Structures are given as structure tokens and as C-alpha cells.
Amino acid sequence: MRYLIAAAVLAAGAFVVAPGWAAGAEPPSCASLGGTVEAGQMCQVHVTGPTYMLNMSFPADYPDEQALVDYIAQNRDGFVNVAQGSGTRDQPYQMEATTEQHTAGQPPHNTRSVVLKFFQDLGGSRPTTWYKAFNYNLGTKQPITFDNLFAPGTTPLDSIFPIVQRDLNRQNPLGAVILPSTGLDPSHYQNFAITDDQLIFYFAPGEMLPSFGGPTQAQVPRSAIPPLAV
């Protein structure tokens, strides 16, 4: 099952990861970020400053919520710090995000995927876009990463890479070549979502194709790759 949730987010500065939370500090939450939980259990955060606007929308009921909120809060803090330390300009610094969610399987052996997409305008020559995916096995109550997505000893990228290459080439009119050194590198497949019949991989500009191609995603049928270990 697939459902998309558009989420306007952060307008303002730069992507900087803040240091870890101080000992004894209250961990971040929707409320601590200044947000409210609205329809669909989505946390909505809207903040403006003299040099920026910040709007965030993310699920407030994700089973590994603290990991998701920590990531958002760290990026929010870094963004605000840079925006507040920068001079004013004609347009405010902007960061926007969307949330895409997917589920797969049937309880108790089901999974949930949340993919955050961030757009950031720092006033440079071109904005920045990146993805951050969170996947969770509701049966084992454990996060899912690419490292534990398949059984040990399998080589899933041998099957995944050719499918990703064909799908991305179909989307790219210039037909850019993806080198095997890139296409077979697991570090490029960390952001994914799981559905009943496919894996969806998300790539930042320049990760698989040239930066001018923008962010991309590729759909890989589960029937064409080794079984998932979930």
C-alpha cells in the first residue's frame, strides 16, 4: 500500500548537523519542535524568522519515532543557526520537505517506510535536495537498513543495479551511463522504501546521475531480486 503526504518544510538556511543532545536534556518531539499533531497523525511545524521560514510535516506515529525526530531536529537546528547568522536578502532562506510513506505485508509481519525529501535554498547557484529514509519491521520491532534487508551471503546488487540503471536511463533523455563502481556501491542504496511488490530507491542529485538531472527514484520489482529478510 502506498500513500503520499505532501509536506512543506523548512525555509531557510543550510544543512548542518547539530551535535548530540546534552545529557539530561529532554529528547526532541513534535511539541518541542513547536509543532502540532493534525489530521493523519502528521506533525506540522511552521516557524518564520527575520531571514527564514521553516515548515515541517512528518508522521507523529512512526514506530521508531525518536530516530526520525532526532534527525529532523538536528537538521532544523543547523539550518536555523546558519539562517540566523546570515545577512538578509530579497528572499528568505528556504528548506522544504515532503514525506512519502509506504507499508508492506500483513500484521504481525509487516513493515513501514517513511521517506523524507528535503529541499534547501541557501542562496547559492543551485538549491540542494536530499532524501532520508526510515524503515521499520513491525514484527521484530527493529529498524530495517540495506545491510539487513537481504539474507547474509546474498549479492542483491547484482540483480538490483541493472534494473535501477534501466529505470534511470528511461527517465533521463540524455541516457547517462552509471559506472559499475557507482551502481554496485551499497552506500548509494541506503534510502529506500518497501512495498508489497517492489523496492523504491531514492537518489540525491549527482548520486547516480549528473546533478542537473535532479533527484531521482527507481522502482525494482521484488520478484526480480533475492527475497527480503523481513
Name each region found by the language model.
Residues 2-6, 19-230:
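Compositionally biased intrinsically disordered regions enriched in Thr/Gly
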Residues 6-11, 15:
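Hydrophobic helical h-region of N-terminal Sec-dependent signal peptides
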